[in-house]
UniProtKB/Swiss-Prot annotation:
Name of the protein in question: Cecropin-D
Keyword Protease found: no
Subcellular location: Secreted
Parts forming coiled coils: none
GO CC term, one of those recorded: extracellular region
Tissue: Mainly in fat body. Lower in hemocytes. Not expressed in midguts, malpighian tubules and silk glands.
Gene name linked to the record: CECD
GO annotation terms (biological process): antibacterial humoral response; defense response to Gram-positive bacterium; innate immune response
Organism: Bombyx mori
Pfam families cross-referenced by the UniProt entry: Cecropin
Principal location class: secreted
Record's function text: Cecropins have lytic and antibacterial activity against several Gram-positive and Gram-negative bacteria.
InterPro entries: Cecropin
Family stated for the protein in its record: Belongs to the cecropin family.
Signal peptide from the UniProt entry: 1-22
């Protein structure tokens, strides 16, 4: 009986450690990549926004 409790406990510990991702620094890399994507999207959208602003000014003026 005692052996089965120890076996279940060891199995639970092994399962818990196998299912946990051990990369806490990876979150910050993903966050940095997301920020870079947003920055790149804003930079690439700038010419389109300028064109729309010029078209709006042309239409009003």
């Amino acid at each position: 009986m005692k052996f089965s409790k120890i076996f279940v406990f060891v199995f639970a510990i092994v399962f818990a450690t196998a299912s946990v991702s051990a990369a806490p620094g990876n979150f910050f890399k993903d966050l940095e990549k997301m920020g870079q994507r947003v920055r790149d999207a804003v930079i690439s959208a700038a010419p389109a926004v300028d064109t729309l602003a010029k078209a709006k000014a042309l239409g009003q003026g």
